[in-house]
Amino acid sequence: MIAMTETAEIDPNVPDHQLLQDIADYDAPDSLSWLHELHLDPQAPMLHLSAEDLMDDSEDSARDYRVSADKIRASFTALTEDSRVKLCCAAEIIDGGLGYGCLDDVDAVLQHACYGRIIFA
C-alpha cells in the first residue's frame, strides 16, 4: 500500500483507449455483483456499464453509465486523496495504468466513476 501525500495521477502517457481496455480485460462483471455488464466502445474511448441502480429497490434494477478515461483518471485521483480509502496497488497504477493494479482497486475506481463514492465494500 502507498500513503499518498500529494495528488496522484495515472501516468498521462497511458493512452485513453489502453486505460479503458485494461479495465475491460478484468472481466469485472463476472466478479463484481453490483456490475451487470461492461463493454468497451470500439468507436470512442468510452466504457458502457450496466450497474446497480441505487434509486430502485427492486432486485434486478440496473442503470446504464458511460464512463470516459478522463472520468476514470479523476476517480483514481480522488480516491488516492481520500484518507478513508487505501488502494493497495496505487503505486503500480500510477506508473502503468489500471492493468498493473488489482480487481479490488478497479472495483473502487469504477464505483467512484459511477456513483461518486464507494457503495459496495
Labelled PLM ranges:
Residues 1-62:
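Long, contiguous N-terminal structural blocks used for assembly/anchoring
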Residues 10-14, 18, 26, 63, ...:
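Alpha-helix boundary/N-cap detector
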Residues 75, 89-90:
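Acidic, low-complexity, intrinsically disordered interaction modules
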Residues 78:
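A motif-centric signal for short, conserved binding hotspots located
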Residues 84:
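Non-catalytic, low-structured ubiquitin/UBL-interacting segments
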Residues 91, 95-97:
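Short leucine-rich amphipathic alpha-helices used at interfaces
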Residues 98-120:
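Short, compact, well-ordered microdomains
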